[in-house]
């Protein structure tokens, strides 16, 4: 009987650990969709971030649950920014303009792996 109880507890512990390690970070498709309305401002074409930009980023911020989520979002934004011609002088202003606290410097040069 002790072996059965031990085996069940071991199995439950394994399943619990497995469930916690398989939580996926925020996918780039979600990041791109939520941040798409910000491209006009981030490239210097618009004079301020649109309401759609701020709403999308606020929704994205609500999905952040872990440090890995922050790092994933950072990596996605960096990858997209290269192909879109994003300019740091505009990009860095978006969090304050949209009243979003990100907890790390917003730049195309941010080292995403140092985020904690």
UniProtKB/Swiss-Prot annotation:
Source organism superkingdom: Eukaryota
SUPFAM superfamilies, A to Z: Bifunctional inhibitor/lipid-transfer protein/seed storage 2S albumin
Disulphides: 28-76, 38-53, 54-98, 74-112
Signal peptide: 1-24
Biological process according to GO: lipid transport
A GO term for molecular function: lipid binding
Keyword line: Disulfide bond, Lipid-binding, Signal, Transport
Keyword set includes Signal: yes
InterPro entries: Bifun_inhib/LTP/seed_sf, Bifunc_inhib/LTP/seed_store, Plant_nsLTP
Protein task: Plant non-specific lipid-transfer proteins transfer phospholipids as well as galactolipids across membranes. May play a role in wax or cutin deposition in the cell walls of expanding epidermal cells and certain secretory tissues.
Protein family per UniProt: Belongs to the plant LTP family.
Entry protein name: Non-specific lipid-transfer protein C, cotyledon-specific isoform
């Amino acid at each position: 009987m002790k072996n059965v109880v031990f085996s069940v507890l071991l199995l439950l512990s394994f399943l619990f650990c497995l469930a916690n390690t398989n939580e996926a970070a925020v996918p780039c498709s979600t990041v791109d969709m939520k941040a798409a309305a910000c491209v006009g401002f981030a490239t210097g074409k618009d004079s301020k971030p649109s309401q759609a930009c701020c709403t999308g980023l606020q929704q994205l911020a609500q999905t952040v649950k872990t440090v890995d989520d922050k790092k994933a979002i950072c990596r996605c934004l960096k990858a997209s920014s290269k192909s879109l011609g994003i300019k740091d002088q505009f990009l860095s202003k978006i969090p304050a303009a949209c009243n979003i606290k990100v907890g790390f410097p917003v730049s195309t040069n941010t080292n995403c792996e140092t985020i904690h």
